[in-house]
Amino acid sequence: MASSVSGAEEVRVSALTPLKLVGLVCVFLALCLDVGAVLSPAWVTADDQYHLSLWKSCSKPAASATWRCNSTLGTDWQIATLALLLGGAFLILLSFLVALVSVCIRSRRRFYRPVAIMLFAAVVLQACCLVLYPIKFIETISLRIYHEFNWGYGLAWGATIFSFGGAILYCLNPKNYEDYY
């Protein structure tokens, strides 16, 4: 029986490796965590008297039962924090879409490097955001009560860590191990 594909027409099809699939899952998780961090109402909380998010700051005097909220987009460091986090989230979204497209088409290898570069850039942006935020918070806002960085801040760190993991997985040289799968 003759082969339907001649030697000149043979196309190299790269297999989807488990590491790239895990990388795609890492990027998806990073994207979900970033959405949660951006929408979180609690980046800093203080004894049920104060909470700060990326969008608003709310305080409640000890004798009062009502919360007084203000926009946080009035100070430059909070705008910079939000811009860095949203920039990183945009890069993660873009890298997720490129990685998803690479799963659907036959030639995957050419997409590995751009995805890894975008993820490393997102990690740098988000790490800058996550270092800037507590430094400027402690420098500018003086709370005389116990306060802690809450789950919104933790979600942003989780997104950064998953982005870094996905970037590492997309950096692995596929030529060394793709033939084994």
Curated annotation (Swiss-Prot):
Topology versus the membrane: Multi-pass membrane protein
Cell division listed as a keyword: no
UniProt main location, coarse: membrane
Superkingdom: Eukaryota
UniProt keyword 4Fe-4S, yes or no: no
Listed GO CC annotations: adherens junction; cell-cell junction; membrane
Listed InterPro entries: P53_induced, PMP22/EMP/MP20/Claudin
A biological-process GO annotation: cell-cell adhesion
Transmembrane segments: 21-41, 81-101, 115-135, 152-172
Disulfide bond entries: none
Family, similarity comment: Belongs to the TMEM47 family.
Protein name: Transmembrane protein 47
Organism, scientific name: Danio rerio (Zebrafish)
